[in-house]
Amino acid sequence: MSLLLLGWLPTGMTHQDPPSWGKPRSHRTLRCYSAEELSHGQAPPHLLTRSARWEQALPVALVASLEATGHRRQHEGPLAGTQCPVLRPEEVLEADTHERSISPWRYRIDTDENRYPQKLAVAECLCRGCINAKTGRETAALNSVQLLQSLLVLRRQPCSRDGTADPTPGSFAFHTEFIRVPVGCTCVLPRSTQ
């Protein structure tokens, strides 16, 4: 799967050293872009134009609709006091999957200015257990867990244009990274009976 993804990325985005298998790794220096080369600290257009087809990934595709409906919780941890809802079939027949699930979840927008795409929709499970389909109430007989999707992102980091250890103000280097993004929740058997 990784090979297929990397096949259509620009050469500058696919920098990977060959596996070392006991040999020392040679680390190539990433290009350091000056403030003049970047528009307001954004990634260079040539890295974004042939991007990793981000708009097709669920965490990216959901952002616009979440922003339109006002679901804006940025870079925070799980909600304090989140309660597992009571499932009432008559109330959720027309609802979205995440609201009808016996392991319901909500989405929030995570924003990271040093990541491209900067905004991602991430799922948060609403229950520790799962909802019993007969009673509509949470049961601890099952556990809600996040479903994770791997997503290739572009990271920016401060860099030095003059070769010193101190970063040059407004200058950045960019590298790719796979992250795991929660896209939903599902029910599983508990790992133990404790």
From Swiss-Prot:
Keywords: Cytokine, Disulfide bond, Inflammatory response, Secreted, Signal. Disruption phenotype: Mutant animals develop normally and do not exhibit any pronounced immunological deficiency. GO terms for cellular component: extracellular space. It is found in: Secreted. One of its GO terms (molecular function) is cytokine activity. It comes from the Eukaryota. Disulfide bonds join C125-C185, C130-C187. InterPro entries: Cystine-knot_cytokine, IL-17_chr, IL-17_fam. Pfam families: IL17. Induction: Up-regulated in the colon, but not in spleen or liver, during infection with Citrobacter rodentium. Up-regulated by various inflammatory cytokines, including TNF, IL1B, IL17A and IL17F in colon epithelial cells. Residues 1-16 form the signal peptide. Belongs to the IL-17 family. Binds to a heterodimer formed by IL17RA and IL17RE. Cytokine that plays a crucial role in innate immunity of the epithelium, including to intestinal bacterial pathogens, in an autocrine manner. Stimulates the production of antibacterial peptides and pro-inflammatory molecules for host defense by signaling through the NFKB and MAPK pathways. Acts synergically with IL22, TNF and IL1B in inducing antibacterial peptides. May have protective function by maintaining epithelial homeostasis after an inflammatory challenge, such as that caused in the intestine by dextran sulfate sodium in a colitis model. This is Interleukin-17C. It comes from Mus musculus (Mouse).
